[in-house]
Amino acid sequence: MEESFMVKSVETITELIGNTPLVKLHRLVSDDSADVYVKVESFNAGGSVKDRIALNIIETAEKDGSLKPGDTIIEATSGNTGVGLSLIGAAKGYKVITIMPESMSIERRQLMKAYGTEVLLTPAADGFGAAVAKAEELAAQPGYFWARQFDNEANPAIHYQTTGQEIIKAFDGKTPDAYISGIGTGGTITGVGRALKEVNKDVEIIGVEPEEAPFISKGQKGKHRIQGISAGFKPSIIDRDVIDGFELVTSDDAIETAKNLAAKEGILAGISSGAAVTAALRVAKRLGKGKSVVVLLPDTGERYLSTGIFGEA
């Protein structure tokens, strides 16, 4: 497996995005199951997998001229992309405005504001589409750059270039038998899936959706508590051809697994991480001993303390 995670000296905070560690699970995995490794994306500078796409979207736009000095970056976000854009905007000197449903966790709003971002809230009852509509309205004005994470090819591209390659390197040029991640924008599973399938066409790429709202797999909308996945529409950047199957996880199971990750493995991760690990444990059981599964943990559980899922203070 990959070499130990090492501290290094860097010139800017953005250099601390990527090269996140893989950690093997022990107490949650049964003896007759495949090995399960979690890719802990909270080790990124801004604390989530979305730091990767935020940096690539901004730097790609700088190179092609669509983002100019003095422009304001705007985005509709469930939180993590907004935090990533806020961090990078602060480091590079851009003003950032984010739009998010009011139902998202308070920690995410606070984090964005800490970086100097202006946060606009849309009614929870209107769903994520209302946040996107507001971003589109602002983007029509001059001097605004809309990150468009659901449609921007810089999103899956960075996961192909970095996240997927990191997994391949960790497996000495090969791949695990299965890779699992939740589907929000679809950028992570698309980019990583493409990278892994170039090396091994037989690797299983499994997407995770809420059982209450499996929109990508079944076209069904519904209320759920797994923040960050199942936006209720199909992002244009998703490559369905790279996805071999889906695992549907209830909100209750996702929360319970997130709690168990913290209590039994010492890994504090968010609700969508709980959903992904729930799915990974099922797949590991099906594959059996001697096989390997990698599952991506998008963020840290610290962003969900106010929801009470880990207990009241």
Feature map (PLM): residue ranges:
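PLP-dependent amino-acid enzyme catalytic core
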Residues: M1-A313
